Amino acid sequence: MKELVLFANLQLFSADVNPINVTTQDSMSPTMKTFYDTALLENAREQMVFTQFGMKQPMHGNKVEWRKFNTFEKALTPLTEGVIPTGKTFGMTKIEATTTQHGDFVAVSDRLELESYDDVIFGATEEMGATEGETYDTLTRNILVAGNSVAYAGEKTSRDALTNTDILTPDMVNKAQTWLKKNKAPKINGSYVAIIHPSVAYDLRNSDEWKEYHKYNDVAPIFKGEIGELHGVRFVESNEAKIWKDGDTCVYATLFLGKDAFGVLDPEGEGMEMIVKTREQAGGPLNQFSTIGYKFCHGAKILYQERLLRVESGSSYGSLDEAN
């Protein structure tokens, strides 16, 4: 019944809201505002697969800033009695990213609120929260897939050379984690992490090595979206893992990460805002609609190129998926 009502009144979600100056008092109580803010943030947080692994910092002005400390060389030269060694100079590098602002809203008519059996405002808030989280995470992903370090499946040397048969294999996973180890990338809770598309995960989970490992190892998930582990890498699934498409061939990016490979503006600080306008505030002279929207600032930056490896591959689903 709910779907029929919503379908019949689909036009009542129209975003053609005419701007009008309305003088009102805020009729939403602080308790209700907190309720809707919490609902939006919880739904947004569930969609943030990439963002969960970033070094989070608050915003300062229109920028977000991270500091990474310089490493030291080994002290292999023996000390000389009575001679003070030269020592090292401690330093750090400041990395900045300019933030961008994003947002959207939906208008809900008074008739839809009256005719629906459900809490339309809360339902719209949940959907807006999910969309906000997906948007935030996609912005983060777009920065990460532009990293300098890339490897290609199937012994190929470029994205253009990849085909749908060049799937991600256990051997490629082993090579990726070896690359991170050789670059001394610290682990995240004892493991490296790979963010993988479900289509690529399907091929990997069909491999004998994956099946054999999980036959004898019960791996408890510790990350949002985690589906399993192989060669010391915990795999986290996301529909937003990057896909490029050319004709019937899709190329998928699987991101292998070490700790603090990138930084991101903390979405739970100044990053996100839920905005609900009641009919009295936004509905014009006849209080005909309310609005539900979100607004956030986003900023992200790769901090350590040597802790982030993008592995591009095909998938047996390559002819069916679309670019994202």
Task: Describe each model-derived feature in a short phrase.
Residues 2-98:
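N-terminal "assembly arms/tails" that initiate or stabilize quaternary assembly
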Residues 67-70, 109, 197-199, 238, ...:
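Structured loops at beta-to-helix junctions and adjacent beta-edge loops in soluble globular domains
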Residues 61, 99-101, 189, 287:
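Short, solvent-exposed loop/turn segments at the edges of secondary structure
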Residues 66, 126, 190, 194, ...:
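Hydrophobic alpha-helical segments involved in membrane association or supramolecular assembly
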Residues 38-75, 167-217:
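Short, low-complexity, charged/polar segments at coil/turn and helix-coil boundaries
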Residues 12-47, 161-175, 206-324:
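Sequence/fold signature of self-assembling virion shell proteins
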Residues 89-116:
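Short acidic, glycine/tyrosine-flanked loop/strand segments centered on an H-E-D-like triad
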